A protein has these predicted regions:
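Exported/periplasmic ABC-transporter solute-binding proteins
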Residues: 1-46, 53-57, 65-66, 70-74, ...
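Phosphate-/polyanion-interacting regions in eukaryotic proteins
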Residues: 62
Length: 238
């Protein structure tokens, strides 16, 4: 992507914490970072896997563990460099300023989804789980209108602009999104906790810089920003 920098391909779920942390990393390490976004999983040219396959240059990927597992299987990752960074549960977003719905129980979630004219979900890891696991388990697939968006940001934009009544997605993509409010987490019985991980890309031209970046993101120094973005870090805070 860019010469003279550590090139990162990142999915939306970890982006809020990442953006908060990069100025400190660049300042303390002297390493410049260049960032490009992509989806953890799914179809289309903007998934991280598709970008790597067509030759987009990257040193580090940050994405869901499910998406990273696919990259590892495709030999796109330097063996042994993958590190788990954070866990994030799924939550519900509604248009800012509207009454927050009851999301405290499975039945409340089911009522909310059946009432919604349109439900926005990301096309990536969480959306795949919602469409193939949760919605069928609730027995509502044939009764709801699901709009899968290429990125989580598109899902919150749909809700903010009135194109969807609710979005179900990682909490980290809701808390700082413009035009939406966080209504709450999915109940524990139907929760999906997503893990975001990082790894060095095979063929990286700066393995040292890439490794230092991942070590920083996995360290206790990054924990506060990760928590503020709605995730739970794997690292223990100082």
């Amino acid at each position: 992507m860019w010469s003279g920098a550590v090139n990162v391909l990142i999915s939306g779920g970890f982006s809020s914490a990442y953006e908060q942390l990069m100025p400190e990393f660049e300042r303390t390490s002297g390493i410049k970072v260049a960032t490009r976004s992509g989806a953890s999983q799914g179809a289309g040219p903007q998934t991280i896997a598709a970008q790597l396959a067509r030759g987009v240059s990257a040193d580090v990927v940050i994405l869901s563990r499910e998406g990273l597992s696919e990259l590892i299987a495709a030999n796109m990752i330097v063996a042994g460099t993958d590190v788990n960074l954070a866990r994030v549960p799924l939550g519900v977003a509604v248009r800012a300023g509207t009454p927050k719905p009851d999301v405290s129980s499975v039945e409340a979630i089911k009522r909310l989804l059946l009432k919604a004219k349109t439900i926005a979900v990301p096309e990536s890891t969480s959306g795949i789980w919602l469409k193939t696991d949760l919605f069928p388990r609730l027995g509502i697939v044939e009764e709801i209108n699901i709009k899968a968006t290429p990125r989580g940001t598109h899902a919150t934009e749909m809700v903010a602009e009135g194109g969807a009544d609710v979005a179900v997605m990682p909490v980290s993509e809701i808390l700082h999104a413009t035009g939406v409010d966080f209504a709450g987490h999915l109940p524990p019985e139907i929760q999906f906790v997503q893990v975001f991980s990082a790894a060095v890309v095979a063929g990286s031209g700066d393995i040292d810089g890439a490794t230092r970046l991942i070590e920083f993101l996995a360290s206790a120094r990054a924990s506060e920003a990760i928590r503020k973005s709605g995730m739970e870090p794997f690292a223990t805070s100082n």
